[in-house]
UniProtKB/Swiss-Prot annotation:
Domain spans labelled Radical SAM core: 138-372
Name this polypeptide is given: tRNA-2-methylthio-N(6)-dimethylallyladenosine synthase
Annotated binding of [4Fe-4S] cluster 1, by residue: 14, 51, 83
Compartment(s) of residence: Cytoplasm
Free-text remark on how the cofactor is bound: Binds 2 [4Fe-4S] clusters. One cluster is coordinated with 3 cysteines and an exchangeable S-adenosyl-L-methionine.
CC terms in the record's Gene Ontology section: cytosol
SUPFAM superfamilies: Radical SAM enzymes (SSF102114)
Family that this chain belongs to: Belongs to the methylthiotransferase family. MiaB subfamily.
Coiled coil: none
Keyword S-adenosyl-L-methionine attached: yes
Upper classification of the organism: Bacteria, Pseudomonadati, Campylobacterota, Epsilonproteobacteria, Campylobacterales
PANTHER family noted in UniProt: CDK5 REGULATORY SUBUNIT-ASSOCIATED PROTEIN 1 (PTHR43020), MITOCHONDRIAL TRNA METHYLTHIOTRANSFERASE CDK5RAP1 (PTHR43020:SF2)
Subunit field text: Monomer.
């Protein structure tokens, strides 16, 4: 098989897409002989892996592929993969006829079958996940990303993911454990378990086996010798039961950083979003986790200006932010998406200037908290896993609760856990000195 064909991949969107891009790379390397290049002009095949959660990445898709078409060498092919591919399908080729094929987010393993078929569109979502093929490509030597499920069964009214990735199906636990074990044998010391709603894992399998739980999966994965740290994203607040929280708190291998997507602090807005929980439920779960895990970092997603959101609703969101004291917030202004239930609320959509101001107010509130909290870490000694060496001679790594830390060091520290005394901070990272 020829090995001189070159592949260029551009990834838009979430961490699931990053893993999907690794899967694409591995499939095409294994079955079609492609090698990856960072130079688009050298590529024989150009793929853009897309996101459709918000409007901006969709607009960016057509801008990007237009530029790719201008830059590509003669005879090079262009493919579109991911959530926008699932959503728009054939319309992508109609709008951009120079696109050679389209492969949906649930069809990555079929990339090898369509890459040579001009005009191919593969967007079905009825795959059997009991035969799921994990990616063998790795972008980080010391951290592995492993999908534990595909799709989503939630019906959040603002979200397009269920229609692009299909129903939620869990990958069999023995396959996940074996994949993590292989990754550890190849040098990984940390694993990131990925799914749209990881803590609803085990409710449905392709082979109709008995139900399982995410807590049990965490216990099974943590038994793997050589694995030092387990992370996961994203959990759903609705499924954060006491059993899960207690396992999270007591299991020393689980990273003490958790993503809890709030979306809104208003119970009435949460109901309109069909999130399934109330403001009080969210605060109760966050409080219980803070109580059991003193050094816990909590990150979140928040949407402002959802249709019908009043000023009182928005103040409820600010109240939750003040009570929980999130360590990182991914803030978004509501973006209407085609095919979502929230489109029926068009008459309740807020003026753009109101949404923009609320976004500013939220960002400013959180900024003030970080400016107060981060300097308190100066003088602390933190243990980090060193993952990379920067051109300026600094190593970069992460603490157990996923704080990014920089320190002077060498490649001898790569893949090792070291102690760093913090000497300086920003709102998002720390700097220090390696100590014995």
């Amino acid at each position: 098989m020829s090995s001189n064909k070159k592949l260029f991949i551009q990834t838009l969107g979430c961490q699931m897409n990053d893993t999907d891009s690794q899967h694409i790379q591995a499939e095409l390397e294994k079955h079609k002989g492609y090698v990856t290049t960072q130079n688009i002009e050298d590529a024989d095949l150009i793929i853009i892996n897309t996101c459709s959660v918000r409007e901006r990445p969709v607009q960016k898709l057509f801008s990007e592929i237009g530029q790719f078409n201008k830059k590509k060498k003669e005879g090079a092919k262009i493919g579109v993969c991911g959530c926008t591919a699932s959503h728009l399908g054939q319309d992508i080729i109609k709008r951009a006829p120079y696109v050679d094929f389209v492969v949906g987010a649930r069809n990555i393993s079929k990339i090898k079958d369509v890459v040579d078929v001009k005009g191919a569109v593969e967007v079905s979502i009825d795959n059997d996940e009991s035969t799921y093929e994990f990616s063998t490509a790795k972008t980080n030597k010391y951290r592995a990303s492993v999908n534990i499920s595909v799709g989503c069964d939630k019906k959040c009214t603002y979200c397009i993911v269920p229609s692009t990735r299909g129903e939620e199906i869990s990958i069999p636990p023995e396959m996940i454990v074996e994949q993590v074990r292989k990754s550890v044998e190849q040098g990984a010391v940390e694993v990131m378990l990925l799914g749209q709603n990881v803590n609803s894992y085990g409710r449905k399998f392709s082979d109709k086996r008995e139900k399982y739980t995410f807590t049990k999966l965490l216990q099974d994965v943590s038994k793997i010798d050589g694995l030092e740290r387990i992370r996961f994203t994203s959990p759903h607040p609705l499924h954060m039961d006491d059993e899960f929280i207690e396992e999270f708190a007591k299991n020393p291998k689980i990273s003490k950083c958790i993503h809890m997507p709030l979306q809104s602090g208003s119970t009435s807005v949460l109901k309109a979003m069909k999130r399934g929980y109330s403001k009080e439920w969210f605060l109760n779960r966050a409080s219980k986790m803070r109580e059991l895990v003193p050094n816990l970092r909590i990150t979140t997603d928040i949407i402002v200006a959802f249709p019908g959101e009043t000023q009182e609703d928005f103040l409820d969101t600010l109240d939750v932010v003040e009570q929980v004291k999130f360590d990182q917030i991914f803030n978004f202004k509501y973006s209407p998406r085609p095919g979502t239930e929230a489109l029926n609320l068009k008459d309740k959509e807020l003026p753009d200037e109101i949404g923009s101001q609320r976004l500013i107010d939220l960002i400013e509130l959180h900024k003030r908290y970080l400016e107060e909290s981060m300097p308190k870490l100066i003088g602390e000694t933190l243990n980090i896993l060193v993952e990379s060496l920067k051109p300026n001679g600094e190593v970069c790594g992460y603490t157990d609760n996923y704080l990014q830390v920089f320190a002077k060091g060498s490649d001898e520290l790569l893949g090792k856990f070291v102690n760093v005394k913090i000497t300086d901070v920003t709102r998002t990272s720390l700097k220090g000195e390696v100590v014995n």
